[in-house]
Amino acid sequence: MHRPSRPARVLTLALATGTLLVTAACAGDTGSPEAAPASPAAKQSPSSPSLSSLSSSSPSPSSPSASATRALTTNGAKAALITEADIEDAWTQVNNAASWRDKLLVGKVDVASFLNGETSSQDCQKLLDSLYSDTLLGRPAGASALTGFTQGDARLLYQVGDYGKGSLEKSLDWMKSLADTCDQFTVTGSDGGKRTVQVVSSSLPAVGDGRQGLTLTVQGTSNGEPVTLKLDVAAVRVGSSGILVTNGGPSGVDHDSTETAVQQGTQRLQQVLAGKTPSPTPTTLD
């Protein structure tokens, strides 16, 4: 699999120069941070959960799939998180992902740039605000967990949680509409600077019970220098549980990593909801 080359600089350089991103201090592995209450996901435990605690309730004999009836537990959510082995390449798992925030996502959408005015602008504002606060699928109704990985100046945030089937279906339908509603719009940042945002649909592997992918491009300035943030956003429904992947950075997006995270993550979640312990992912890439 061909992967684009990346700058050798590390994420902390981008943070130090203040070009894009802010990260608040956060303790513990992949946890839901006290310092960043906007994040919905629960803290990831380094210990391996027992098989019996991965999901609650048993599927009925007539149920077509275990994922349709099982509820995700806290231990199950942690077990469903992907690992470095799942996405491979040069990704490194980090312990502060719950506090990640992208400054370029903060701003007020320009209502005047929409033909149908306030209605469309509200959807686009919701998109930016929910991406910033890690709540694109809403607040989990049950158990949840998250983890994150870095590679150069790119970051991949992976969330899994029980959101409820109906809520997830509405979220996926809403995401599907954004490529038309929010195809291009302008945002005014807190510094008064103008940013251009483009949203397009992106393809995902045919996994889960429903899925939707978007690619978001934000162009603006930081410290007087032009800067571009490009993000893949991918959501998958498995029963009443959902997966959300946000991947990218100022150097662009590795779409292959997004697709791999979606594919491997869906498989892990399905195994957990079936009452199984996800098996380690074998290395298959050069």
Where are each of the predicted segments found?
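Sec-dependent bacterial lipoprotein signal peptides
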Residues: 1-24
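A short, solvent-exposed beta-edge/loop patch
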Residues: 58-60, 197-263
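Sec/Tat-exported extracytoplasmic proteins
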Residues: 84-91, 95, 167, 179-186, ...
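Soluble non-cytosolic domains of exported or imported proteins
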Residues: 71-72, 81, 118, 169, ...
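Surface-exposed amphipathic alpha-helical segments
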Residues: 247-286
